[in-house]
Amino acid sequence: MVGAGIAGLSAAMAMRAVGCRVAIVERDPEPAPDVDHWRRSGVPHAVQPHFLMGRLRSLFLDRYPGLFAMLREEGVDEIAFADYLHPLARTRYVPKREDALLTVIASRRTTLERTMRRFVHRNSMATIIPHTTVNKLLLAEREGTPYVCGVETRTEGSSRIIPSEIVIDATGRTDALARLLASAGVESNTEHFPCNILYFTQWFRLRPGKTFPSTSGLPGQIFDDFVIGALPADNGRFTVTLQVHRDDTELTTLAKHPETFREFCRRLPAIAPWIDPDRAEATGPIYGFGMMDYLWRSWVVKGEPRILGFFAVGDSVIRSNPRFGRGCTWAALGAHLLADVVAATRDPRLRLVRYEKKLRNTFRKDWMTMLAIERTTQRRFQIAVGHTPATLRDRFASLLDRCLLESLIADPAVFRAVWSGYNGFARMSSWTTRFDIWARIIKRSMVGPGELSNLINQLRTRPSRSEIGEILDRFAIFSS
């Protein structure tokens, strides 16, 4: 295994469960004793918010109840389906058995990773070799196809050969091992699409005796030129994250500076209560992140593997915009799909073909849905800033969005249908094919906002583009 992040640790747990002996090579040093001071330099997005889906929670509860217990001991919390409902929807809420599955994990990425690492160590699931890089893949040949039979590592100037039956790439967005294979003449079939979004995140800590603000849905506001959200984590920590478009100079400049960032947040009704100085205090700087893209990598071309004994998990094989919260969950689920395949056959060709087929059957439709949403998001930004005129289709889509928003707030059945897809228990787009859900949305739209008017108006309240410029001028910060 190369990489001891969420994907690598998940793969170690899964592979050990099917009888494999596992070694993990990790380029970062051992974690700091205190999670608050652990800086995961090899994973720059570790400081960004991570939505940990109900599907991931179910995996932990089903296969690793001891890990889940350790997470709870570390202060990791849970947020139940009913907790996301608006008070109006709660008056109409009739619980269903499956609602328990729609409980999410509230944790910092670093808390989750450190706890998983302790769990792996406590249960002797893998040997972790820290502060070590892989500078070469050992290649042989089997029936005319390159075969990875180990790695050459380097630790503080000292090299070491580690032979292995299989090598698993969990290096994430760095694509480190894919580049090593490419340099050896082994190319993958890669679908790649850039993401035009930048993340700017600041961490906060609740003051003693304070609680998170009451909310409905994911706390935040969505506009065509930006998205902002607050996400609870463990031990009273939470993030506020502003997502802006890469070529939006004003908002990018505003997001980089704590003074303008917080002034902007104070003018957004869904976010202002979270950063109230009486409720919470900032615990660090603003962290920017722009290494975001969509990627689908395959080593099987026209039914034939291009490489044997080599598999990729997590962001090394499938990537999407982190706002959809797929990263950690898909990494863990994909690792277990791989372990199932490895346990079922020793044929290296069948292993890769079956693994990639399982990935496609499990994740491909949602990946395509997210990519379509991403392209729509980019178009809407161009319309919002006046670069592209809105068509009749664009206006109709915006109208549908408003109708859906009202139903998500007021109707537990609609929220359940959408939330099930968001948490990985149905396809993300499954609700769009359900007549009963559309009937509820249409019925709600015919009633009109009514008692939702105040909330809808709040969610639409924001600084105008001219007010954004005024915020920058007030703090003598100029976009360029």
Where are these regions (language model features)?
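N-terminal FAD cofactor-binding segment of flavoenzymes
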Residues: 14-18, 34-87
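Short beta-strand to alpha-helix junction loop
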Residues: 51-52, 99-118, 170, 176
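C-terminal helical "tail/cap" subdomain of flavin- and related membrane-associated enzymes
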Residues: 339-480
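FAD/FMN-dependent oxidoreductases across multiple families
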Residues: 106, 250-337, 341-367
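Helix-loop-beta segment of a Rossmann-like dinucleotide-binding subdomain
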Residues: 89-109, 113, 148-150, 243-247
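Predominantly flavin-linked oxidoreductase catalytic cores and closely associated redox partners
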Residues: 122-264
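N-terminal Rossmann-like FAD-binding beta1-loop-alpha1 element of flavoenzymes
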Residues: 1-30
